[in-house]
Amino acid sequence: MTINLGIIMDPISSINIKKDSSFAILLEAQNRKYKIYYMELKDLYLKDNKPYSHTKLLRIKNNKKQWFTLEQQKDVSLSNLDVILMRKNPPINRAYIYATYILEQAERNGSYIINKPSSLRSYNEKLFTTTHFPQYIPKTLITSNSTKIHNFIKTYKDIIIKPLHGMAGLSIFRIKEHDPNTSVIIETMTKYETIPCISQNYITDIQKGDKRILIINGIPFPWCLARIPKKHENRGNLSIGGYGNTQKLSKNDWEIALSIAPTLNKKGIFFAGIDIIGTKLTEINITSPTCIQEIEQDTGISISTIILDNLEKNLKKRKTNRYL
């Protein structure tokens, strides 16, 4: 039976097909003859309390000049789709939040939404670590109060400060004690004490890499991508010039990943990417985890295949349970 798969993502015209994780998943889905319905956030709507979206049938190919075609525009009931992948990148703004409510209605009507809409809405990727796994994180302060941030710097001498809603290494600053730019950075980050941000002690092991570990259906993948900063940089993100080094998970990585995985499963988070620097957990990415292609290329193991095998297994379970 053909699986009807919906995907909500940023414009497909703007992706880098050599790196994009959604593209890798879609390519495998197409190989399995899934019918793929392409959507952007703006396409979703509720009518008479029923969830719909304007969609286009998506066909893709591994060609960097022309990698997609969109056909047969039509509005569909989200409840008629077997599975919907919510792969829209942050920020988690009002439009994103409203979309999760629409998806939640489709979920109530039987659609399988990855990841669970209420979890996408409830668990900030940086706060999630502090509220659920404080034993694994660096020294952390979340506040908009400039005096408290100044005192945190005094205590730890060398810190990282970043927005709670950011991604891809954007707006991340390293501040050392007596840095002449400290006050202006804090003013900028907190928007003059109106928006909280997260401060953590600087971890020197960042120079060995910020490790992205993928967890699929409650099972950690045994290889990770260590994203190593370029010279004179504190951020390892590939999008800003860091380079990737695929590694086997260390004993500490396994301990953290196996501790986190059951909670993710319980909360309907089918696919996540956790970030570890040294021995410390820094983020749990649940909106649109990346690094599939980089790890696949280095290991020869198709993560996309593992994802869709598990997705299909879960779909079968859901259908069986529905008829019990």
Curated annotation (Swiss-Prot):
Broad enzyme group: ligase
Alphabetized UniProt keyword annotations: ATP-binding, Glutathione biosynthesis, Ligase, Magnesium, Manganese, Metal-binding, Nucleotide-binding
Keyword Manganese: yes
Family: Belongs to the prokaryotic GSH synthase family.
Gene Ontology CC terms: cytoplasm
Keyword GTP-binding appears in the UniProt entry: no
Top-level taxonomy: Bacteria, Pseudomonadati, Pseudomonadota, Gammaproteobacteria, Enterobacterales
Signal peptide bounds: none
MF term (GO), any: metal ion binding
EC number, as in UniProt: 6.3.2.3
Sequence ranges assigned to domain ATP-grasp in this UniProt record: 125-312
Reaction(s) this enzyme catalyzes, per UniProt: gamma-L-glutamyl-L-cysteine + glycine + ATP = glutathione + ADP + phosphate + H(+)
Binding-site list for ATP: 152-209
Pfam families attached to this UniProt entry: GSH-S_ATP, GSH-S_N
Binding site for Mg(2+): 283, 285
Name of encoding gene: gshB
Name of this chain's protein: Glutathione synthetase
UniProt cofactor(s): Mg(2+); Mn(2+)
Co-factor binding details: Binds 1 Mg(2+) or Mn(2+) ion per subunit.
Protein's pathway: Sulfur metabolism; glutathione biosynthesis; glutathione from L-cysteine and L-glutamate: step 2/2
Family annotation (SUPFAM superfamilies): Glutathione synthetase ATP-binding domain-like, PreATP-grasp domain
